[in-house]
């Protein structure tokens, strides 16, 4: 696997020197300063590449070229945004970049309710609390029809949770959910958020699939023509939220995506933390089934809680993800490719490290502090080395 590191650009508190010292050789980044829907010019791409090259690093994966909301709803200037997306892909390929991660989550990117969940050892993790989220939906956002998505017991618990909240806690929970986490390109006020949700009235899972199918039928031929691998990121969490459909959550969704445009360039990001939140997602079986389509991996572990819809980020080698089995499955696919003549390594990045040690005293991007990811990368690197020595001695 190619060891990579997500970097949010020049304003990231983690420097490129830090990235090199962590042992990563590739960087996963994006041009966050370019508005959604606009073309990424060759000049801007080359500028970012040069910045990385100065530190001896390569731009291994784009994460992400954002998919404009109008593409997802098929409204407004959606076709122009698709045309711009295609041009961005061509420009990236012309600059030698061959892997692009993207997602098709409506309105929100990845979602958490607590960005400072304290673990027993004093480190901090990200958490999604189903009851806190219900309290937000039912009593802060007051989304029409939200009660239908929660059991009577969850509604009772959510009311108690909300009643115990002070004004500052309401503000913090709201910001955690709608203000935009790292990598999300848009944040909202409550009124803006309600308006954005309303744009999806009448859009169910089947309709969103139709919209994604149109998008893929437009962009995959372009990616194929210029040798650029697309890797869709799963929904996080992997289920419908806020009354919105989600269509990249299960093995059935992956099969649909594979078939809708049957090209190896129409591929997946295997995010073990996102898919792994669902107990019915067999990660190893998914890797084995869709191995030739897996172009990028996010390796992390989550811990499901008493309410199975609640979870927090675990240590990389703990939690509900069998990291040994996952890494072995990825290396099996990598070995298969090498035997077929494809010597490219599958890019991997350690995802969502705990905030720990000296980073507890620093301003960090939630989930993306340096030391927690350094620890995760070192642990996964060790697992990879051991598996290679025992099972794949021919691999470098």
UniProtKB/Swiss-Prot annotation:
Record-linked InterPro entries: Man_deHydtase (IPR004628), Xyl_isomerase-like_sf (IPR036237)
Catalytic activity, reaction form: D-mannonate = 2-dehydro-3-deoxy-D-gluconate + H2O
Cofactor: Fe(2+); Mn(2+)
Pathway: Carbohydrate metabolism; pentose and glucuronate interconversion
Disulfide bonds: none
Source organism superkingdom: Bacteria
Keywords: Iron, Lyase, Manganese
EC number, UniProt record: 4.2.1.8
Single GO MF annotation: ferrous iron binding
Pfam families listed in its UniProt record: UxuA
Family indicated by similarity: Belongs to the mannonate dehydratase family.
PANTHER family on file: MANNONATE DEHYDRATASE
Protein function: Catalyzes the dehydration of D-mannonate.
Protein name, entry field: Mannonate dehydratase
Organism this protein belongs to: Edwardsiella ictaluri (strain 93-146)
The gene coding this protein: uxuA
């Amino acid at each position: 696997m190619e060891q990579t590191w997500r970097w949010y650009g020049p304003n990231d508190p983690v420097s490129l020197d830090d990235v090199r010292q962590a042992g990563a050789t590739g960087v996963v980044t994006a041009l966050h300063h370019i508005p959604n829907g606009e073309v990424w010019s060759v000049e801007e791409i080359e500028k970012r590449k040069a910045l990385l090259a100065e530190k001896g690093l390569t731009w291994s994966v784009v994460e992400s070229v954002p998919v404009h909301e109008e593409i997802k709803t098929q409204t407004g200037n959606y076709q122009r945004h698709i045309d711009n997306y295609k041009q961005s892909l061509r420009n990236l390929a012309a600059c030698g970049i061959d892997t692009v991660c993207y997602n098709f989550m409506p309105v929100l990117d990845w979602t958490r309710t607590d960005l400072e969940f304290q673990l027993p050892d004093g480190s901090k993790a990200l958490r999604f609390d189903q009851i806190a989220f219900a309290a937000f939906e039912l009593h802060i956002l007051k989304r029409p029809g939200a009660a239908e998505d929660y059991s009577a017991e969850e509604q009772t618990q959510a009311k108690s949770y909300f009643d115990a909240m002070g004004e500052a806690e309401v503000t913090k929970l709201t910001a955690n959910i709608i203000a935009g986490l790292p990598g999300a390109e848009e944040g909202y006020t409550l009124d803006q958020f309600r308006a954005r949700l309303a744009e999806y009235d009448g859009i169910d899972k089947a309709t969103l699939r139709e919209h994604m199918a149109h998008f893929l039928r437009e962009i995959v031929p372009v990616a194929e023509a210029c040798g650029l691998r697309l890797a869709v990121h799963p929904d996080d969490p992997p289920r419908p939220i806020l009354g919105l459909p989600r269509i990249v959550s299960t093995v059935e969704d992956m099969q649909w995506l594979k078939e809708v445009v049957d090209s190896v360039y129409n591929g997946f990001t295997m995010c073990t933390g996102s898919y792994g939140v669902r107990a019915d997602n067999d990660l190893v079986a998914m890797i084995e089934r869709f191995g030739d389509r897996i172009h990028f991996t996010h390796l992390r572990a989550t811990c499901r809680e008493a309410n199975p819809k609640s979870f927090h980020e675990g240590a990389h080698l703990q939690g509900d993800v069998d990291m040994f089995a996952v890494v072995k499955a990825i290396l099996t696919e990598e070995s298969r490719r090498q035997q077929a003549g494809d010597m490219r390594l599958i890019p991997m990045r350690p995802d969502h490290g705990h905030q720990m040690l000296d980073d507890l005293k620093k301003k960090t991007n939630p989930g993306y502090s340096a030391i927690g990811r350094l620890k995760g990368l070192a642990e996964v690197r060790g697992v990879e080395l051991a598996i290679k020595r025992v099972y794949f001695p021919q691999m470098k």
